[in-house]
Each structure stands twice: as structure tokens, then as C-alpha cells.
Design a protein with these regions (language model features):
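Non-heme Fe(II) oxygenase metal-center motifs and adjacent flexible, charged/small-residue loops
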Residues: 1-211
Length: 211
């Protein structure tokens, strides 16, 4: 059974970044890190309601290889997606991108969203494709709606890191995280609906660093 989503006591009002919230940095290795800032966005409930109702959601097909048969086929991704260039994105995405740019020193110009409708929606272990074009991409995620688990694991094997992100939380992956680590949003029985709004940048970005 899917749990109903309950609005946060702190999620009302107009959506806006809270400049007083300072992210906590989690060092994954010598060149990879994650920043976590709970309640970074005020008014998260209003953004959740608006983006769920108005975004041009699409459920994409993904080609999958079957090692047992040697064949391939397509499956529906277990989530809905959409995306914009930042100038065309609905509010408050441009203001959020501006706040992230001021903090991380790169111009965030693309925004995408994943809608996890219930606990059976998920995304498998992966590194973002931006790793093919950027040495140290910064990927910033604003979470809206119900809490969900977020996992990270090193590509070469080793202990994983498990986090829980709630509505209004900011999670940022930086350094060589997309190259040397994978991340996932696993299935979570009973979880309510959640949207992740992800900001990326086309410019080269910084050199790998944990500072």
C-alpha cells in the first residue's frame, strides 16, 4: 500500500532558498563529496503541488539487454520525467539555479525532474551522463514531497552510503562523484510521492576538490 503524502509543517509559503542554511559536506573519498542541506528550500510543498500538476511529464522507454537470451527489448522507466533549460523553466527554478550558482561557482543552465509516484518507482544504480563531458560536474538535487532513501556506492566496490532526503532538502554531488561513484533511489514500500528537481551545468566547472 502506498502511503499518503503529508505536507511538512515548514513547507508552506512561496518557494525560495533559505540563505541561512549551510550544507553539511560528506567526504566520500579524496576527490568526491556530497553536500546535504535539510530544509534548504522554504515553501517546498507549494512547488511540489505545482510541478506535479503542471509539468509536462513523460514516461520514457529504456532499452534493456537480456544476458540469458542475448536479446534486448524495451521497458518503461519506473518514474515520470521532464526537463527544461533554466530560463524557460517554471518558477522557482530560475531563482534556485541562481542561488546554487552563487554558492558553487558554476552556471546551472539545465533542470530536469523525476516524479516518483509511489514506493515502487525508482532509479537504478548509475552515474550521470555528464561524466562523459565534465571532469568534476556538480549535480544539485532539490527534493520535494515525501522522504526517500538515496544511496551512493563506489564504482570499484566497497561500502555504500545511505541517506534519507525529505521535502525541501538539497543534496549536491561534486568532485569526481559521477565518475567514481554511482547513486540510486531504491524502491521503498509504502513511500509517498516525491519529485526530485535536478540542476546541471554545461560549462566545464571546477577541478576535482573536496574543499
Amino acid at each position: 500500500m502506498t502511503a499518503a503524502w503529508t505536507p511538512s509543517l515548514f513547507g508552506g509559503g512561496e518557494p525560495a532558498p533559505d540563505p541561512t542554511v549551510v550544507p553539511r559536506r560528506i567526504v566520500l573519498d579524496e576527490t568526491s563529496w556530497v553536500d546535504l542541506a535539510p530544509a534548504w528550500l522554504t515553501g517546498a510543498d507549494a512547488w511540489f503541488d505545482g510541478i506535479v500538476a503542471e509539468a509536462p511529464w513523460d514516461q520514457r522507454r529504456r532499452r534493456m539487454y537480456d544476458p540469458a537470451t542475448g536479446g534486448s527489448g524495451t521497458v518503461m522507466e519506473p518514474r515520470l520525467t521532464c526537463g527544461w533549460r533554466v530560463p524557460e523553466a517554471p518558477d522557482p527554478a530560475p531563482a534556485v539555479a541562481e542561488a546554487l550558482t552563487a554558492r558553487y561557482g558554476v552556471r546551472f543552465d539545465r533542470v530536469s525532474a523525476n516524479y516518483y509516484r509511489h514506493g515502487d518507482d525508482s532509479v537504478a544504480w548509475h552515474g550521470d551522463r555528464v561524466r562523459f563531458t565534465h571532469e568534476a560536474p556538480i549535480v544539485a538535487i532539490v527534493s520535494l514531497g515525501a522522504p526517500r532513501r538515496f544511496g551512493l556506492r563506489p564504482v570499484g566496490g566497497g561500502p555504500s552510503t545511505r541517506l534519507t532526503v525529505a521535502g525541501g532538502d538539497l543534496l549536491v554531488m561534486g568532485g569526481r562523484c559521477q565518475h567514481d561513484w554511482q547513486h540510486t533511489v531504491p524502491k521503498w514500500p509504502g513511500a509517498g510521492p516525491r519529485v526530485s528537481v535536478t540542476f546541471r551545468h554545461d560549462d566545464p566547472g571546477p577541478r576535482p576538490s573536496i574543499s
